[in-house]
Design a protein with these regions (language model features):
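Short catalytic-loop micro-motif centered on adjacent basic/acidic residues
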Residues: 56, 84-88
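Short small-residue beta-strand/loop micro-motif enriched in glycine and branched aliphatics
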Residues: 52-57, 110, 135-137
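Mobile-element integrase/transposase regions
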Residues: 1-43
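RNase H-like two-metal-ion nuclease catalytic core shared by retroviral integrases
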Residues: 88-90, 95-101, 110-131, 140-152
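C-terminal domain-tail junction helix/linker
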Residues: 135-180
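Short conserved beta-strand segments at catalytic cores or DNA/RNA-binding microdomains
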Residues: 34, 38-55, 71
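Generic enzyme active-site microenvironment
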Residues: 30, 46, 87
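Active-site beta-loop-alpha junctions of metal-dependent nucleic acid enzymes
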Residues: 38-39, 56-80
C-alpha cells in the first residue's frame, strides 16, 4: 500500500462521470492545499473545472477537520447546480471525505497517487497563486482580505482557454441570477 494514502475507501477518479472530463457541465471542482513556509501553514484552493472560477480558502490549520469544515463552508455558499463533485489528491487533509459528502452532497473523487496531471485546472491555478505568494510564504501572516484580493484578481483575469473571458464573467453568464 502507498504510505501517502491514508484515505479510507476512496472513490477513484476513474469512477467520475464522463461529463467531468469534457468540462461541458459546470459544478465539478478540483481542490488542493497550497503549502506555506516549512509546510506549517496553508491555504485551500477550490477551482471549478468549466469556468476556472477560484475560491481561496483561508485555513488556520491543515488537519482534516479544519479543511473539511472550511471547504464545507465554501460549498454551502454555492447554488446546488454548482455542487456536483470535487476531485482531490490523496492528502491526509481530505481523510474526512465521507463526512464532507454527507454534509454537502458533493461526491469526492481521488486522483491516483503522484498524478497531478489528473487535476490540471487546480495545478495550473496553484501556479498562478504562486505568482502572488511564492514558496516560503507564511500564510499565517496573510490576511483574509489579501487572499480575497488575489482570488478576485485571478477570477477577473481573462483566460485564453475561456476565449479571453474571465472566470468571473464566465460563471456569472452561466448563472446570472446567482450571487457570487
Amino acid at each position: 500500500a502507498d504510505k501517502r494514502t491514508p484515505i479510507k475507501a476512496p472513490i477513484r477518479i476513474d469512477e467520475r462521470p464522463a461529463e467531468v472530463l469534457t468540462r461541458e457541465i459546470p459544478g465539478h471542482w478540483e481542490g488542493d492545499l497550497v503549502l506555506g513556509k516549512n509546510r506549517e501553514s496553508a491555504i485551500g484552493t477550490l477551482v471549478e473545472r468549466t469556468t476556472r472560477f477560484l475560491i481561496i480558502v483561508p485555513l488556520k490549520k491543515k488537519d482534516s477537520t479544519t479543511v473539511r469544515k472550511a471547504f464545507e463552508s465554501e460549498f454551502r455558499k454555492l447554488p446546488d447546480n454548482l455542487k456536483l463533485s470535487l476531485t482531490y489528491d490523496n492528502g491526509t487533509e481530505m481523510a474526512q471525505h465521507k463526512t464532507f459528502t454527507k454534509n454537502t452532497k458533493v461526491k469526492v473523487y481521488f486522483a491516483h497517487p503522484y498524478s497531478p496531471w489528473e487535476r490540471p485546472t487546480n495545478e495550473n491555478t496553484n501556479g498562478l497563486i504562486r505568482d502572488y505568494f511564492p514558496k516560503g510564504t507564511d500564510f499565517n501572516l496573510i490576511s483574509k482580505k489579501q487572499l480575497k484580493e488575489v482570488q478576485n484578481q485571478l477570477n477577473e483575469r481573462p483566460r485564453k482557454t475561456l476565449e479571453y473571458e474571465s472566470p468571473l464573467n464566465t460563471i456569472s453568464r452561466l448563472y446570472m441570477n446567482q450571487n457570487f
